[in-house]
Amino acid sequence: DISEFGGNPSGHSLNDVFKRLEYCSKPLVAAINGITLGGGLETALCCNYRIASKQAFVGLPEVNLGLLPGGGGTQRLPRLTGPSEALKMMLTGAHVSAKKALDMGIVDLLSENVVEDSIAFAKEKALKDSKHPMVRDLNDKMIEARGSENVLVEAQAIAAKSRKGQFAPGQIIKCVEAAINLDDFDEGLKKEGEYFLECLMHPQREAMIHIFFGERSASKISDVPKDTPTMDIKKAGIIGSGTMGGGIAMCFANAGIPVHIIDQDEDNLKRGLSVIEKNYDFMVGRGRMTSEQKDMVFGLISSSLDYKDLHDVDIAIEAVYENLDLKLDIFKSLDEHVQENAILASNTSGLDVDAIAAVTKRPEKVVGTHFFSPANIMRLLEVVRGEHTSHETLATVMSTSKKIKKAAVVSLNAPGFIGNRMLFNYTAQANMLLLEGALPHQIDQAIESFGLNMGPFRMMDLVGLDLGWRARQLSGVESPLHAKIGDHLCDNDRFGQKNGKGYYNYSEGSRAPNPAPENEEVYEKISS
C-alpha cells in the first residue's frame, strides 16, 4: 500500500515471504490478469512460471514515487529480460503489454483463459517435472553483461534525460550494477534493501508520493456525487487556430475524438493546420508515431470558417486571445449555432467565466477549460467552475480530461485561477533578477539544476510573450516594472519560439535556446 511507505514495518519482510514462495516444493504459476504493477509483478517474478492474459500489462513504476522496486525486482527482472531492457522499464516506469512481456521473457505464455490455463499448466508441470526454474538462478544474462559499461552508461543517459534531478533512478542503476557483478543473489538483495532505504529516507520520496495522491484527490469533487451522469463527448469544436487552438485540437485527435476547428481568417486557419501537421511530422521523425498513425490522427481534424459547422459538436472550446469583449461575442454565436445540450468552454487564463456564461441561455453548460501551452504536451488542465456550472457539466469535463490524458484540477472563478496566480510571482521575480544583472540562461540553468524541466525564460518563450503583453494592453493599466521587459520585447517583435526570438534566439526549425546579447541593452535600460 503506497500510503504505508515511510511508516513502521510490521510482520514478515517481503523478501522472507518471497523466498518461501521460491523454495516451495510445488510448481508455482502466476496467473497475471489486468494490470500487474510493483509488488504484484515482483510476486509473480518469485513464481516458477508466469502466464498472462492477452489484455494484461506489467510494470515496476516505483520510480514515479521516488522509490525503487524493493521486493527483489531490481535483481530478478534483469535475469529474465537482460539488464538493458530491465533498466529501461524501471527507469521509465513503463507499463508493458502482455505481448511485449512475452517477447522480453517476463512471461512464459499468453492465454485467453488465464486462471484455467494456469491451473492446468501447474498440474502438468507437477506431474512431469521434479525441478522448476527459479528466476534467482538465471545468471547467464548477468555474466554476459559483466565487463561492459555500455549498459550502465546507456541507463545513466536515460535517467539524465527523463529523470533530471531525481534521486531514485541512480539507486536503481546501482541495484542492477550489483545484480550484474555479484555472484550471490542474496547479496544483491541486501544491496537493493540498502538502496531502497536510502530512497525511503530521501525527501523526494515524500514529495513524489504527495504528488501521486494529490493528482488523484484533485479529480474528486466533494459536492459532486460519484454517480453524476456524464455526457459522451463524441466530437469537439475549437474556436481559434492559433497556438492554443491547434494544441487543444491535437489533444482530442490524439484520443481518437473527431475535432472541428473554425477561424475567422482563412490564412490563419491554413497556417494553424500547417503547424499541427508539422507537429505530427516531428513526432513521426522522432519515432513517436508511424506515418500511418499520423494520417489517421490528422484525418480526425477538420476545419472551416463558419460557426454553423459546429452544430453537432458535444463540446465547443473557445481558444482565442484574452479579450473579454471578443469572447463574449464568440459565446453568443456558439449559443446560437451549437446544439442545446453541448458544453461551451473557454480556454481563458484568467477572465471572468461567469461574465462569459451570462451572455448565453445555458450558463449551466458553461465552464472554463484552461489548457497550458503547449496544450498538446502540458498535462495540467484547470477546470474553472462558474457560479451556475452544473454537476453534469463539471463531471463530464473531468471525465473527458482523463480521455485526453490531462491532470485536471478544479478551480473557482477567481482572477488568474490557480496556476497563473502562482506563475505571476515566479516570473516577476525572474524578471527582477534580469534587472539586477543576471542573464536568462544563468537563471534558467539555476532553476533547471534544481530539478525543474524548464527555467522561467525558456518557459515564457515557449508559451509566447505576446499572450501576457496583449492582456496588459487590454487592461489599460501601466505595466509593473518587471513586466516592462516583456512589453519591450514584444514591441520589437520578439514573441518567443513562435517567431524565433524572445528572451532567447532560435534557429529556424529548432527549439534550442541561444543567448540573445542584443536584449541586454533592454534589461539595462529598464533597470536604470
For each predicted feature, which ranges?
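Acidic/glycine-enriched connector segments
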Residues: 2, 17-23, 43
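N-terminal glycine-rich phosphate-binding loop for ADP-containing cofactors
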Residues: 5, 9-13, 24, 36, ...
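Active-site-proximal alpha-helical scaffold in enzymes
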Residues: 40-43, 47-49
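Conserved catalytic cysteine-centered active-site region
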Residues: 18-30, 34
